[in-house]
């Protein structure tokens, strides 16, 4: 692909088109809209500039035929070019930083990637500063996330095909929501997909999450369906109270009453 093989590029483009169509379909189910989606190939020109600028600044060393950059405080250097002349993820990540800074000049760039890539981003961020792609006003952040684990607490095995596909999870969540009493399709989707989102967000970002249908769809405790149920009940009470003329002055609540209100609120 990097050498410009036309046949390989056509096959690759077909794979990209099919994948993006599927991604968009799932994003739509989740209510997610992507403003800009640039794949690695988009940065082909930027990658050449990165290599040229790294050489120009004299920060590149040769190691066993590969081109690397030493990173302060790290034993392992960051590889920009393999011995066979192929670029690396790091080179393309640096090209991405270069493009984003020149295009949008953001104050913060957040990378939401697995915790196992921590060293990679420490090195990339360091080299990005060496190349002067980011100024002192720009913060580069790696938000580390954990893994989804099988119900037995072990990693899902992609090689053995023992995984749970997101689309299957969303579909099953909607069906389970119907069994909870959400017979209307729109309501079932709101409850089911909401449960999946809430289950994910209710855990710490860096924590591994054990996949558990019972906790995800529970009608009690810290779950999406329970939060939605509570909200619906609250709205019902407020609607019935519209005809009543009353007001509450928080200044008139005593300490015990305030504690009760705060306990309910949490």
Model regions and ranges:
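Non-catalytic interaction-recognition regions
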Residues: 1-266
């Amino acid at each position: 692909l990097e050498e410009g093989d036309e046949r390989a590029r056509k096959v690759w483009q077909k794979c990209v088109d099919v994948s993006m169509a599927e991604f968009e379909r799932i994003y739509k189910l989740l209510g997610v809209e992507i403003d800009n989606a640039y794949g690695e190939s988009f940065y082909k020109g930027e990658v050449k500039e990165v290599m040229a600028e790294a050489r120009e600044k004299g920060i590149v060393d040769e190691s066993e035929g590969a081109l690397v950059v030493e990173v302060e405080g790290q034993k392992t250097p960051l590889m920009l070019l393999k011995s066979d002349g192929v670029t690396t993820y790091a080179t393309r990540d640096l090209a991405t930083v270069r493009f984003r800074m020149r295009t949008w000049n953001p104050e913060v760039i957040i990378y939401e990637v697995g915790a196992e890539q921590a060293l990679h981003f420490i090195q990339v961020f360091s080299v990005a500063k060496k190349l002067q792609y980011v100024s002192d006003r720009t913060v580069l952040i790696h938000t580390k996330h954990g893994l989804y684990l099988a119900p037995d607490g072990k990693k899902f095995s992609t090689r053995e095909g023992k995984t749970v596909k997101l689309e299957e999870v969303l579909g099953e969540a909607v069906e389970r929501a119907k069994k909870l009493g959400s017979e209307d399709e729109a309501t079932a989707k709101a409850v089911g997909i909401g449960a999946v989102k809430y289950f994910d967000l209710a855990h710490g970002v860096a924590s591994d999450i054990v996949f558990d249908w019972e906790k995800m769809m529970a009608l009690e405790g810290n779950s999406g369906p329970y939060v939605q149920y509570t909200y619906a009940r609250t709205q019902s009470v407020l609607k019935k109270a519209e005809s009543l003329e009353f007001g509450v002055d928080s200044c008139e609540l005593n300490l015990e009453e305030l504690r009760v209100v705060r306990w309910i609120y949490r």
